[in-house]
Amino acid sequence: MAIHLYKTSTPSTRNGAVDSQVKSNPRNNLIYGQHRCGKGRNARGIITAGHRGGGHKRLYRKIDFRRNKKNIEGRIVTIEYDPNRNAYICLIHYGDGEKRYILHPRGAIIGDSIVSGTEVSIKMGNALRLGNALPLTDMPLGTAIHNIEITLGKGGQLARAAGAVAKLIAKEGKSATLKLPSGEVRLISKNCSATFGQVGNVGVNQKSLGRAGSKCWLGKRPVVRGVVMNPVDHPHGGGEGRAPIGRKNPTTPWGYPALGRRSRKRNKYSDSLILRRRTK
């Protein structure tokens, strides 16, 4: 991804750093209108997820996470921007005439060929075939992968964000051991499929929106500290001037501990599959 800096004509362009290479050119048979109701509110209109609201209208691009087009070679035709995710997507033209969107693998360029299925090679000569999808049982150890299935046939659910990559570190019995982007080490069935390579748009965290209006277009509302609120709005609020929070430890707006509290459900079915907890 190439970061583009504007000439300093206004404060917003002076501080902004955007990607100017990838554009959006969606295909009509692969896009759908979506009604983004709520925007952080529940059915009663109460805010349940903060800092959400507004934003530009979006068309949903149908992404092929299942990669169930078996043993039919496809070719990358375009690399496009998707407003619904921070990763890029690429349009694939398959040999039988069908067209699908997939997540753009880092390093893949227009004209590259991809294929999914069993016994699919991840190399062609000395070149890596980024974007090929195959079961974990057919991948060598140490392979960098993304778009990983948890349930066989359900489609990829892990490592789908921009720059995300997991690593296959072991295979034993019916399970494969993966190290996920969060640092978590867990077991997954060897029959589940994954895509070879890393998700593209690695430098997404280097972008700078430059002004509040650009953040508003993304549907993100301002973040307000609890210490500057009133007591009715937050436990940290109130006081005269720059007052401390008045508690031993920081809390959420609903009074629960804010730092270090585990949010994962207890006795979840997948606890036995996690060998090491996430580190970030």
Swiss-Prot record:
One GO term of the biological process aspect: mitochondrial translation
Record InterPro entries: NA-bd_OB-fold, Rib_uL2_dom2, Ribosomal_uL2, Ribosomal_uL2_bac/org-type, Ribosomal_uL2_C, Ribosomal_uL2_CS, Ribosomal_uL2_dom3, Ribosomal_uL2_RNA-bd_dom
SUPFAM superfamilies membership: Nucleic acid-binding proteins, Translation proteins SH3-like domain
PROSITE patterns: RIBOSOMAL_L2
Gene3D superfamilies noted in UniProt: 2.30.30.30, Nucleic acid-binding proteins (2.40.50.140), Ribosomal protein L2, domain 3 (4.10.950.10)
GO cellular component: chloroplast; mitochondrial large ribosomal subunit
MF term (GO), any: structural constituent of ribosome
Annotated coiled-coil segments of the chain: none
Keywords: Chloroplast, Plastid, Ribonucleoprotein, Ribosomal protein
Disordered, as annotated region: 1-25, 231-280
Subcellular location: Plastid, Chloroplast
Signal peptide: none
Family designation: Belongs to the universal ribosomal protein uL2 family.
Subunit structure, interactors included: Part of the 50S ribosomal subunit.
Protein name: Large ribosomal subunit protein uL2cz/uL2cy
Organism: Platanus occidentalis
Gene coding for it: rpl2-A
